Amino acid sequence: MRKKILILGSTGSIGTQALEVIASRQDQFEVVGIAAGGRDPQLIIQQAQMLGLAADHVAVANEKSATQVSRALGAAVLSGRDAATDLVESVPADTVLNGLVGSMGLRATLATIQLGEVLALANKESLVAGGTFVTSQAAPGQIVPVDSEHSAMAQCLRSGASAEVSKLVLTASGGPFRGWSREEMWDVTPEQAAAHPTWSMGQMNTLNSATLINKGLELIEATLLFDIPADRIEVTVHPQSIVHSMVTFCDGATIAQASPPSMLLSISHALAWPHRVPEAQPALDFSQASTWDFMPVDNEAFPAVELAREVALKQGTYPAVYNAANEQAAAAFLRGRIKFPQIVDIVGEVVAGSSQFAGVASSVEEIIAHESESRRRADALVDKLSR
């Protein structure tokens, strides 16, 4: 029997690649619904028609785009800010791939967990924002990571018992400004920040990779997914992006997962978990000479990782504060209001002034309230810096 799949964020980088994977494995998977923000209504229409989806199996957040898609499909699609969550709640599925961008994916993540469906999670921000409020509601193995780094860790962790794990090692490409000083990055433009040396991603994910905020979010996500404290997670720069992550065990052995830099493998693995998909992507060719480099993160130039470690150790809703403040500061940089290094400066300042967020959230509303306050503070700092 084919697995029924919902894809949230179908027009984004993860969503389009997931559709590519599923198109080549129609004997294993069936797409039963899609959700998107609405920036590209024509692509949503094309996807819905190609998949043969009824209008009520399509969700579009942007109301204007939803009207356009509804007209093309001949009936009303689900629309509005909570359209993706409405889709999850109304269309039964075996697996929900959450590839939405930012913390807007939180409600859909929670809805998936509460329905008992498998959550293939690419929307790390929803886990970071929700923290233990999310993980405490999930059954063991219900959340399956899509990020290549966490997928790699999950694969490596199958090599030993949890009590045998000494540390996790996250790899980072280093982004387009690897080796630059803070001073050299002062006049970086949004166009420069959008040029990732290895991966093809959406605008926000690419910018987060340039600041290493993305790696900070991944560190926090790893603590939640694998129940390993942040002081036992190492981050190393690996420019080739071939070793996606490693796990060191108590006997001194380190197990690494290596494959060419592509999301096809980790997406396939998440959809088929706990099984592997044959020939999901080409394997490494060891007959070709190559060099793999590993080096420490320059924490002076890129303080985002150590700030994330601090946030993860504090717990509470600090991770939600970290993420929300970054979303505001990053948007301000893209609009030309602040300088590139000031993105993480603002995040650090908001986190430092948020002692009231130390408690564990007891509701989605509480998380959203803390996020809103963090955004307000970040916006105030942007206003101050851009005068």
UniProtKB/Swiss-Prot annotation:
The protein's annotated catalytic reaction(s) are: 2-C-methyl-D-erythritol 4-phosphate + NADP(+) = 1-deoxy-D-xylulose 5-phosphate + NADPH + H(+)
Q: Name one GO biological process term.
A: isopentenyl diphosphate biosynthetic process, methylerythritol 4-phosphate pathway involved in terpenoid biosynthetic process
For whether the record's keyword set contains NADP, the answer is yes
Chain positions recorded as 1-deoxy-D-xylulose 5-phosphate binding sites: 124, 148-149, 173, 196, 209, 214-215, 218
Any idea of its EC number? 1.1.1.267
Q: Name one GO molecular function term.
A: 1-deoxy-D-xylulose-5-phosphate reductoisomerase activity
Q: Which Pfam families match?
A: DXP_redisom_C (PF08436), DXP_reductoisom (PF02670), DXPR_C (PF13288)
The alphabetical list of record keywords is: Isoprene biosynthesis, Manganese, Metal-binding, NADP, Oxidoreductase
Ligand binding (NADPH):
11-14, 37, 39, 123, 125, 202
UniProt pathway annotation:
Isoprenoid biosynthesis; isopentenyl diphosphate biosynthesis via DXP pathway; isopentenyl diphosphate from 1-deoxy-D-xylulose 5-phosphate: step 1/6
The UniProt record lists the keyword Manganese: yes
Q: Which residues does Mn(2+) bind?
A: 147, 149, 218
Identify which cofactors the protein needs according to its UniProt entry.
Answer: Mg(2+); Mn(2+)
Q: Which residues form a coiled coil?
A: none
Question: What is the documented function of this protein?
Answer: Catalyzes the NADPH-dependent rearrangement and reduction of 1-deoxy-D-xylulose-5-phosphate (DXP) to 2-C-methyl-D-erythritol 4-phosphate (MEP).
Similarity field: Belongs to the DXR family.
Protein known as? 1-deoxy-D-xylulose 5-phosphate reductoisomerase
Source species, please? Answer: Corynebacterium diphtheriae (strain ATCC 700971 / NCTC 13129 / Biotype gravis)
